[in-house]
């Protein structure tokens, strides 16, 4: 969507773009032992562009959009993300994490006076996220859950250590007049379910790509917190979160992302130490937080189809 929009401004003709995106992640350590560490590799973006324009012009176009894309800039910018913890209505001091300076983060329990529901007055896409029913060929196979190298300090190593990479694959085909980009996304393993995620570059009929990125980070982080609460038997309930992704732009530099600001709200009888430990472990195993802490230059490949 962004490339089409930029092409229109540059008076360049593009009929169709097929896009494949591969995001690869791996885990070292053990989720069970609580020493897991998520890692990310640079995204691979493969474009097949149907156009009669010269290849050099398309290359320049892609480079221009890459420089101003909020999502791609987030991948290129290493961030020291910030956090806050509010337990039973009281803000707690964090000892081992970067403390957020924001003092007015919204508690979802107070922000939403009633359960959120779709806006019936607006013509939104009914395919924002959809399980398609398609399943990748093959049979689901279990993996080794303890992935520690023999050189991991005092932690016993796994003699059969290997970097088990999980790749998320997204494919889309977008034509010049399309208002919404639909991405078929799947975990690149046998037997996995396919989903459709829809985006509107203007954020009108569906979330914008930046909105989708924010939702993905939130979902990934909260998934880890719920897993750890259950596995570690933390006395924590009523988990909710507010997250702020801020971008900075000025005339002297391209768009840059500022540290992701995450605010966790909990109830329960868990100690302050357990509450902070929950955030710490969840951040370390969240693949998307791992993505944001590194400078990961996307690999963009393209070919022109006449």
Segments from the language model and where they lie:
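Extended beta-strand/beta-hairpin segments
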Residues: 5-215, 225-306
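Alpha-helical metal-binding/catalytic segments enriched in His/Glu/Asp
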Residues: 1, 220-221
């Amino acid at each position: 969507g962004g490339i089409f929009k930029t092409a229109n401004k540059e008076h360049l003709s593009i009929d169709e773009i097929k896009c494949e995106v591969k995001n690869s992640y791996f885990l070292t350590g053990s989720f069970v032992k609580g020493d897991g560490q998520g890692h990310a590799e640079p995204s691979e973006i493969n474009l097949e562009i149907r156009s009669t324009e010269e290849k050099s012009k398309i290359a320049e176009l892609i480079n221009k959009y890459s420089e101003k894309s909020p999502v791609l800039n987030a991948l290129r910018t290493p961030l020291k993300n910030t956090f806050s913890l509010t337990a039973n209505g009281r803000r707690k001091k964090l000892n081992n994490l970067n403390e957020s300076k924001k003092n007015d983060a919204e508690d979802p329990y107070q922000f939403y006076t009633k359960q959120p529901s779709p806006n019936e007055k607006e013509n939104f896409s009914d395919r924002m996220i959809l399980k398609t029913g398609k399943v990748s060929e093959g049979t689901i196979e279990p993996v080794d859950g303890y992935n520690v190298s023999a050189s991991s300090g005092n932690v016993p190593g796994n003699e059969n250590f290997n970097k088990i990479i999980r790749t998320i694959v997204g494919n889309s085909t977008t034509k010049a007049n399309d208002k919404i980009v639909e991405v078929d996304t799947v975990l690149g393993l046998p037997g996995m379910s396919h989903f459709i995620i829809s985006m509107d570059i203007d954020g009108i009929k569906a979330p914008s790509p930046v909105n989708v990125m924010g939702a993905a980070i939130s979902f990934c982080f909260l998934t880890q917190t719920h897993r750890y609460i259950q596995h570690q038997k933390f006395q924590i309930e009523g988990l909710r979160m507010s997250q702020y992704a801020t971008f900075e732009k000025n005339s002297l530099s391209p768009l840059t992302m500022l540290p992701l600001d995450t605010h966790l709200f909990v109830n329960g009888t868990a100690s302050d130490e357990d509450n902070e430990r929950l955030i710490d472990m969840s951040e370390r195993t969240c693949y998307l937080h791992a993505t944001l802490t590194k400078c990961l230059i996307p690999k963009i490949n393209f070919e022109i189809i006449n």
